[in-house]
Amino acid sequence: MPLLDSFKVDHTKMPAPAVRLAKTMTTPKGDEIAVFDLRFCRPNQEILSEKGIHTLEHLFAGFMREHLNGEGIEIIDISPMGCRTGFYMSLIGVPKNARVLEAWRRSMEDILTLKSEEEIPELNIYQCGTACMHSLKEAQEIARTVLDRGISIMDNEALKLQL
């Protein structure tokens, strides 16, 4: 089985919160696709709470689209990592890391402005597979931690595993 790109980086060296351009590819029609690693916490040292990451999944995708889409960039998907240390974001176009960082920072600020769980999009049994597993408080704690620590940009060369 081929080794996936995400397993070719040394997770012990990953800073967090941090942005990493994980992969780029070109479709047969010539569209550029980018995948970003948005690492919220240090692998094997911290983990995002299940309610917090689930609520972030509902909020983060919308706020990131508000702040990042445009000028040849369109988010395809933002999904939580199985290890619960961050999210992968797939896009049409390849924005600069600094632009992604700024959109992420602004999204965390947006999350802190919410007053109640009624403001969480698609939080109902018809649109969410586990509607009872949410916590705005935990999502806001994660957002506050990201802002307090500051977001950096990862260096792919420094993270490359010597296989």
UniProtKB/Swiss-Prot annotation:
Cofactor note as given = Binds 1 Fe cation per subunit.
Reactions that this protein is recorded to catalyse: S-(5-deoxy-D-ribos-5-yl)-L-homocysteine = (S)-4,5-dihydroxypentane-2,3-dione + L-homocysteine
Question: What's in the keyword line of the UniProt record?
Answer: Autoinducer synthesis, Iron, Lyase, Metal-binding, Quorum sensing
Keyword Metal-binding in record: yes
Q: Where does Fe cation bind?
A: 54, 58, 128
Provide the E.C. number(s) assigned to this enzyme: 4.4.1.21
Q: Does the keyword Transport apply?
A: no
GO BP, one annotated term: quorum sensing
Against Pfam families, the record matches this protein to:
LuxS (PF02664)
Cofactor field: Fe cation
Q: Which residues form the signal peptide?
A: none
InterPro entries attached to this UniProt entry: LuxS_sf, Metalloenz_LuxS/M16, S-ribosylhomocysteinase
Q: What role is this protein assigned?
A: Involved in the synthesis of autoinducer 2 (AI-2) which is secreted by bacteria and is used to communicate both the cell density and the metabolic potential of the environment. The regulation of gene expression in response to changes in cell density is called quorum sensing. Catalyzes the transformation of S-ribosylhomocysteine (RHC) to homocysteine (HC) and 4,5-dihydroxy-2,3-pentadione (DPD).
> What PANTHER family does this protein map onto?
S-RIBOSYLHOMOCYSTEINE LYASE (PTHR35799:SF1)
On assembly, the entry states: Homodimer.
- Family statement drawn from the similarity comment of this UniProt entry: Belongs to the LuxS family.
Write the protein's name: S-ribosylhomocysteine lyase
Give the species: Wolinella succinogenes (strain ATCC 29543 / DSM 1740 / CCUG 13145 / JCM 31913 / LMG 7466 / NCTC 11488 / FDC 602W) (Vibrio succinogenes)
Gene name of the encoded protein? luxS
